[in-house]
Amino acid sequence: MTTVYDVSAGELIKETSRDLKENVKLERPEWSIHVKTGVNKERKPEDEDWWWVRSASVMRKIYMEGPIGVSKLRTLYGGKKNRGRKPGEFRRASGKVLRTILKQFDTLEYTKANKNGRTITPKGRSYLDGISTKINKQ
């Protein structure tokens, strides 16, 4: 059986985000159309499907690096802030966005909260492995 480790990250995230939007019906909160993904960004995302792309990326991170918490995810998705003439500094990503995505996965039972952070459940693992198998057959 094909796993997440056997397919490229870009293809997996693209296919998973499409599936989360169309089949799983992962809902984007109303406030998400107005927010930036972090303090280091100057504008909100241009891609209208950014919520599902970020969700797919977070799910892959939990699969590969779990258990992983919100703090570590904020660091992974953070970036350099442009401070004008002053030197740029690293800023962490938005915690609200990541917490909301993780809560959505918990309600779908794709992840489970532990003492050390979120881990992928067997249901979430089989979901991602199924998408990986579908990508590998193409």
Where are these regions (language model features)?
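Short amphipathic alpha-helical elements of helix-turn-helix/winged-helix folds
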Residues: 58-65, 76
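Short, amphipathic alpha-helical interaction segments positioned at domain boundaries
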Residues: 122-138
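A short, conserved structural fragment
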Residues: 102-116
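Long, low-complexity, charged/polar intrinsically disordered regions in eukaryotic proteins
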Residues: 1-56, 60
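Short acidic, hydrophobic short linear motifs in intrinsically disordered regions
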Residues: 67-89
